[in-house]
Amino acid sequence: MDRYLLLVTWREGKFRSVAGGEIEPGTEATSLESTDKQPDLTATNIYHLLKRSISDSIHPDDSTFPACSVGGTPHSRKWFFAVQAICGFYQFCSSDWQEIHFDAEKDKIEDVLQANIEECQSAVECFEEDDSNSRESLPLADLYEESAENLHQLSDKLPAPGRAMIDIILLPSDKDPPKLKECLPIVGALKHLKEWHSAKVIIAGSYCEINCQKIAEYLSASVVPLEEFRNAIDPRELWRGEIQMRERKFGFEISFPEFCLKGVTPTNVSAYNLNTCFLAKKIASSKVFHYYGPALEFVQMIKLSDLPSCYMSDIEFELEVTGHCTRQNSMLLLEQISSLCGKVGALFVLPCTVSNVLIPPPSQLASRKWKEYMAKKPKTISVPDVAVKGEFSGYHLLLQGMGKRKCRATLLHSASQINGSFALSVIHGKMKTKAGEARPSFPFDFSSLPRFSEEQVLQREKQLASFQVLALKECLKRRKAANQPEAFSADELKSLLALTRERFLGHFDVLPTEAALAQTDTVKAAGVVNDDGTVEPYSSSLMETNPLEWPERHVLQNLETSEKAKQKMRTGSLPRSSEQLLGHKEGPRDSLTLLDAKELLKYFTSDGLPVGDLQPLHIQRGEKPFVLTPELSPGKLQVLPFEKASECHYHGIEYCLDDQKALERDGGFSELQSRLIRYETQTTCTRDSFPVPTVLSPLPSPAVLSEPQSVPEGEALQGELRTEVSGLKRRSKDPSCLYPQKRLTRSESSDCLPSQASCNSNHHHHTGKPRKPQAERCVSGLPLPGREASKDTSKTSSGQKRAHESKSSKQMKESRSQKHTRMLKEVVKDTLKRHHITEAHESFTACSQRLFDISKFYLKDLKTSRGLFEEMKKTANNNVVQVIEWVVEKMSKK
């Protein structure tokens, strides 16, 4: 990660110019180390101090993050510097981040600082010539506003997250430090860098713990003495962030902030290191940009004996807490990790995004967004999510304790990084070993010899003896087939056994596979003596004898499979919609029962039909499985009585039907409800001759039937019936869906056919059954003369019969849509007749068809049939003239 240093100084009084000769080169360090007098803290002096301190601390052999992908190697780390200084009533700020060149004696930054200091000095001298009262009357708030705006402009030029580490050094005035309210704008700009850019703030001063206590608390800054501020920047820091531990099952997460990784100088370099730097002269790899994650994620605890030695690298780092850390939980975690010594380690991963191009600064972290966010006055400051595009990779680190709150982080090679490098390192190790054998060293190095236990030696000798017996039998067999004497001489037998032993030790592993795998983790000095007397690495013998365990085979995966695995890791904590409804799918997915051909044929007849009824698969969803009733089939379920069927459990059966035709009752009730809801707002016809009791009317009143545009359509009614029946099937368990709120309709006409909806209280289903007309009973109860009552009764009954017959015959002959078509044709005919286009006219057929189509096109958008007849007339009258002219013109052309 690149390092960005920001120097912020708040000083009073007069600047001492470096160009004036008051400070000689090299004396600024002694002036700071002395405590007798106030040191001369100009921006140039501080820059020289930091540059010299960083240059002395940087070691070229310190460990850095290597390449984590095949795209290329990361760019070398760079250092940048910027300054924002306030002196009296004047301030200046760097316009951009300037790169620090440690190999140059003087760089561009010094020229910029010198020019700014001279400008500031001239401004201060001008102020001294003016009156002191006018100088004090200058608005100090505007000065801090201007300084804050300059800092915001610098923050907008920072790279994307994960690319830079920012260190801010604040040097306030010791005599009269500003209060928090006065310098709030510039402190807010520093807060922006602290929260959204993960900057580290250091306040240096003699009495800053007292004078700048509130500022330090607001910025979570560490306070150091003035003499130690140059040591506050640690050049060995490669990464700063937090440690995250997640609980995948419940989605819990805990963070430990203020951790850092530091590079260390390697003490020894192994010959079997997977680094292929010796090819760097021939192959020039491309440069890429690394964007590191903000957190070191915990993976698992690991036993060192279970970790293959080929995955270990020689690159090591130090994990520590940042300087002046005050987080107790972070200190406690560091103590726990530092106690991991010996056989156990903690495995962590540092995410990294690799990009071929430099990603521009994101707009989500801009100063404008910060001002808008702080204007809302949030209780807690949250960092916006920024998506860095590129190749997703990471570094696996094995953490082990070093004591005294220090941890060693060893870099592990991933499967993609070890591809091919393992075999290459083995070959390289062989070459070095053979070259070293030419010049033997004394005394003899016994550590290079292999170490075996007693059981392993005995097992090897037993295998060798059996192998020699087989070789001897084969030799006798061949001599007999060649008609040679079977007798062996002593020299021939000795040479045969020696050759057999040599071939056995040269081409076969003397250890079993399990023991060989265990030895690779525990035995450090491994080698096998071959026929040439040279020492072979133990890993090469492992690679020859057990190819299935080669590390290269772990990376021979399909790209699509790896992408699916990454997608599952990203979305593994989020439940799917089907799992939210049905529960998590428990049990292995690949647990399929495979049948032989004979076993499969047992379940089918000679015709290819199944032997028995098909049974549903037992699929467990959730914690409570759906237990099926044993020996139950659809045929058996149909003949069971209701009491027994309701206690059974069968796949797909949500409810059972009783013996009282509940489905027909539901259909009748839905038909009744659909009619009531459809025609509940229509008016009724009343007569004052005699009252009729109020009933639920499933049919429309005669007044509704008399209107041609309000005749109920039979097809639509049947469609609603089917819809309601299917809806009741789905909602049969919800009693509130079966009993919607009913509306009462008064039917006081003697011409209507009354009916009554009956409700059975013993069952959960309602039905409406048509009954005989009750008008006779209602009328007979009135105090009327007997003759008139009988006449009225006979008239009423005959009128009801005629109305019922005419209505039923009309519904059987003509549907609603057919009636609307007939009505529209009659309206079109009458309209054309008024315009002197009768049936005898030659253009009557064309005009009527054209006017019918146009009128039908305009009438199809109507949402209700009320007033349909008037709309037909209006539409036909509006379009009849245009239709006649169009038809006449068309016929004249013919």
Swiss-Prot record:
Tissue expression per record: Expressed in small intestine and spleen at low levels, in the ovary at intermediate levels and in the testis and thymus at high levels.
Residue numbers spanned by region Disordered: 563-587, 701-822
Pfam families found in the cross-reference section: MTBP_C, MTBP_mid, MTBP_N
Keywords of this entry: Cell cycle, Growth arrest, Phosphoprotein, Ubl conjugation pathway
Signal peptide start and end residues: none
Compositional bias per record (Polar residues), positions renumbered to this chain: 750-761
Modified residues (Phosphoserine): S591, S633, S697, S701
Sequence segments annotated as region (Interaction with MDM2): 515-894
Function of the molecule: May play a role in MDM2-dependent p53/TP53 homeostasis in unstressed cells. Inhibits autoubiquitination of MDM2, thereby enhancing MDM2 stability. This promotes MDM2-mediated ubiquitination of p53/TP53 and its subsequent degradation. Inhibits cell migration in vitro and suppresses the invasive behavior of tumor cells.
Entry-linked PANTHER family: MDM2-BINDING PROTEIN
Name of the featured protein: Mdm2-binding protein
Gene assigned in the entry: Mtbp
